[in-house]
Amino acid sequence: MEQNNQLQPPVFNQPQPSGPQYQPRVSASPMMDPVEAVKTCFRKYFDFKGRARRSEYWWFILFIVILSSVFNYGGLLLPFLSYVGMLCSLLLLIPQFAAMTRRLHDTGRSGWWVAILAILYVVVLVSMAILVAPYGTQLFETTDSMVQAEMMADAFQSNPVVATVMTGSALLGLLLMVITFIFTLLDSKWGENKYGPSPKYQ
């Protein structure tokens, strides 16, 4: 029997397989429920480190919105509730900024976005306080919107520098809020990043 012992010519430029050769298997943990999310954000009141998935952050934001609405509408019937609502809003600023920082970390972004937003928020509050200080409590005691508008117009005209700083800070803050809002809608980055392990993909 004749055997074919001829050598086969080498084949060059063979197509190489595309894509990663190893795909790690990851699974998403169940979405955090509202109660657990709120408890987690309060437990991490001053925690600006680590990561937070979307369900943790947005359930907490919904909790803040509902609580603020209750106090705002309740203040129409019982005026003291408005002051309680303002106090609660101030107390919730820190955990809200902390949760937002962890949410940005979860998408692989820096928390400096939140730091700049917080600074602009403080600038707006201080500027507003300087503008309305000459009117004392008159601006808040009157229920006439026309009178309030006239007071604010006089305040802006009497101190144009502070008014300009407040307006510029408010506009820049609004732009940053839109940007960070989009960031917080993004899904978690699977695997560990420089801020810690993924809270969603294990």
Task: Pin down the residues of each PLM region.
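Generic signal for short, ordered secondary-structure residues
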Residues: E36-A37, S82-Y83, D154
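Short amphipathic alpha-helical segments, especially helix-boundary/capping motifs
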Residues: P15-Q21, L76-L78, D154-Q157
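Juxtamembrane non-transmembrane "cap" segments at the membrane-aqueous interface
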Residues: V132-E150
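Short linear motifs in intrinsically disordered/low-complexity regions
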Residues: N5-Q6, Q14, S145, A155, ...
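Membrane-interface extramembranous regions at the lipid-water interface
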Residues: E2-Q3, P9-L67, L92-W113, F181-Q202
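Membrane-interface segments at the starts/ends of alpha-helical transmembrane spans
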Residues: E150-M166
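Hydrophobic alpha-helical transmembrane segments in multi-pass membrane proteins
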Residues: S55-F97, S110-G136, V162-L185
